[in-house]
Amino acid sequence: MRNSAMQQLNPSEISALIKQRIGDLDTSATAKNEGTIVMVSDGIVRIHGLADAMYGEMIEFDGGLFGMALNLEQDSVGAVVLGNYLSLQEGQKARCTGRVLEVPVGPELLGRVVDALGNPIDGKGPIDAKLTDAVEKVAPGVIWRQSVDEPVQTGYKSVDTMIPVGRGQRELIIGDRQTGKTAMAIDAIIAQKHSGIKCVYVAIGQKQSTIANVVRKLEETGAMAYTTVVAAAAADPAAMQYLAPYSGCTMGEYFRDRGEDALIIYDDLSKQAVAYRQISLLLRRPPGREAYPGDVFYLHSRLLERASRVSADYVEKFTNGAVTGQTGSLTALPIIETQAGDVSAFVPTNVISITDGQIFLETSLFNAGIRPAVNAGISVSRVGGSAQTKIIKKLSGGIRTALAQYRELAAFAQFASDLDEATRKQLEHGQRVTELMKQKQYAPYSIADQAVSVYASNEGYMADVEVKKIVDFDAALISYFRSEYAPLMKQIDETGDYNKDIEAAIKSGIESFKATQTY
């Protein structure tokens, strides 16, 4: 039977079968995990192949250089180079790594200055971080969040009384150049010395000398002990300036997710948007309003949504039960620079709509010597009110009202020659409150300091003090209370409570101060 089957298959059929098999064989090469660089320009590379690349995946080049895939096209991939792209050439190989960008996280980064990839740039040796985490992460969902009800003291009387910031809030600092935006952010970090809040300062597109000055000031005040500085200077590639805020956010989230509180400052997001616009245009993405790409809103919303107050359940789940009954928070103070006070430009309006309030700093106020140059009329905190300490909440109502009435009356007073007694008193009180809100840089006020100042103003103890002497009077009053009423000040700082006994103690303290001092 077997022999007869062999006889039926003649040699010509065998050769035809073999030819058919050879013809059907697919010999075309498909580049899956390796590709070839076909174009290099301005920190952007176009790679032919890499069919398996993911969006945001790390791409490895020859010489240990890495890139990040941002454009996935039919037969090529557009990537930004994370580092010096001048060593790359057309024809070189590029490989998928299967990993997304990660940066080191943990307490080891406190006191250090790092770049957008978490590499130390302060000359203090390597960072021995035990953990790394993804730069791009999804923000906690609604179910895991908790309402903001604890304060972040910025140390500024004008902010803590009228525009309070809570833990887990996003409060925008917006203003023209040279209006004190960075100074306010640095003071907010210095004010956290005794609060236990860890800080991250992200410098985007700034001069290296400016960043060095900030670091020096933080070291002088002892604030560097609980602060990490992430620096993407003006001379760094656009890709680094684009990534720096996300890297800093991941470093801050390490503390939030473990039931601690953190504060992050993005200085400033206008420059990040410009860097992202540059990358997008080089990647040939279609431009939109002001030449920004269509997803510039998403650029900032996905970053700022990661700042949140998370519930104890979230922390417990994240730490696998290691931390219980602790909520965590990441508070964001993004900074936006406006051009000639134009807050209706594209990026400012985007960030205003994403954040929970804004602090407007004005050039005219700054030049008039009112520093911090906060415009209390259009500055607002949408959630901070519920986070204020009891004593500040109780006392600060009069400040906002006095300033609002003063602004309204000051406009009328320009045209009216004779003013009645009540109006004149309101104007004078408004002038004194405006003067009281002035504050020197690097001199944060504690809760107790603010309470004493505001109480003295509200109850008319400054009515007989000359306007130009208000600042000196206030400084002397605080100094007197710190030396003569130290236990009371300590109690207010620790509890934030306000009752009849505390009010009586503050009142008698101010009266005894006024009896000994003449202003």
UniProtKB/Swiss-Prot annotation:
The keyword Cell membrane is annotated on this UniProt entry: yes
Reactions catalysed according to its record: ATP + H2O + 4 H(+)(in) = ADP + phosphate + 5 H(+)(out)
Transmembrane intervals: none
EC number: 7.1.2.2
Protein name from the UniProt record: ATP synthase subunit alpha
Topology of the protein relative to the lipid bilayer: Peripheral membrane protein
Site annotation Required for activity: residues: S379
Record-annotated disulphide pairs: none
Organism for this UniProt entry: Acinetobacter baylyi (strain ATCC 33305 / BD413 / ADP1)
Pfam families named among the record's database cross-references: ATP-synt_ab, ATP-synt_ab_C, ATP-synt_ab_N
Highest rank taxon of the organism: Bacteria
InterPro entries: ATP_synth_asu-like_sf (IPR023366), ATP_synth_asu_C (IPR000793), ATP_synth_asu_C_sf (IPR038376), ATP_synth_F1_a_nt-bd_dom (IPR033732), ATP_synth_F1_asu (IPR005294), ATPase_a/bsu_AS (IPR020003), ATPase_F1/V1/A1_a/bsu_N (IPR004100), ATPase_F1/V1/A1_a/bsu_N_sf (IPR036121)
